[in-house]
Amino acid sequence: MGPDPSLAYRPECHEKDKTEFRNFENGDLFDRVFNTYKLMHTHQTLDFVKQKHQVWSNCSHFSLSMMDSIDSLDELVDESDPDVDFPNSFHAFQTAEGIRREHPDKDWFQLVGLIHDVGKVMALYSEPQWAVVGDTYPVGCKFQNSIVFRNSTFEGNPDGKNPAPNTEFGIYEPQCGLDKVLMSWGHDEYLYRVMKFNKCTIPEEGLYMIRFHSFYPWHSNGDYMHLCNEKDQQMLPWVKEFNKFDLYTKSTELPDVERLKPYYQSLIDKYCPGVLQW
């Protein structure tokens, strides 16, 4: 018998040391990753984010089933990811299978693992990757030091020269809640909006995972707590639990997608069936 393929999906058994993930200091993909964040941190202003909400949140661009949207990610390699250089569709199934092993009783959680990055389809419909992928962070207030490449990529951002949004709270009230905070625009917020628009029935915990899984300064570094309300604090453990599968299931051992599809199609049919508006 050959090696157990499930090892590729089990965070606790993964052959890659956890300290090797999210290496933003060197590596074969460093230049690509840095350049993506440089563009993001230069152009993602408060006004830019408001504009993208107007463009994408009405979900009037195209119609596509969830599985077809996942398949479309075969064409996308995330240029902000220092860990992988293969299509995003494989990462979807890796994440879902990792969750399935650890949480076999939570089918909605498994589905979130599968679909969490599907908002990246924006990159296949005219958006540059710096407006789609990568870590997210609030705009309209001080950029915290935990943001990736904080000290080397924001010098060209006009908001950095505006005193109003450069305080700890900026345009927000203390403990206003993340629902009232404008995040840098990307696939997290877009997919959240698609889920709400199409009345998908994924539980609130899953919607939080979708909306904030890329908000590393919050869920992994503990920043921006001054903007969080009680609900955000209650949901944080769920986002943290999701993160370990999102991050540590990445592997060059790619899953047998065709074998897995029927099971995950049944979850799609349960929580976000049919053709969706994007």
UniProtKB/Swiss-Prot annotation:
It catalyses: myo-inositol + O2 = D-glucuronate + H2O + H(+). Its main location: cytoplasm. One of its GO terms (biological process) is inositol catabolic process. Coiled coil: none annotated. It is found in: Cytoplasm. It comes from the Eukaryota. Substrate binds at R22, D78, E79, S80, K120, G134, D135, H213, S214. It is an enzyme of class 1 (oxidoreductase). The keyword Iron applies. PANTHER family: INOSITOL OXYGENASE, MYOINOSITOL OXYGENASE. This is Inositol oxygenase. It comes from Danio rerio (Zebrafish).
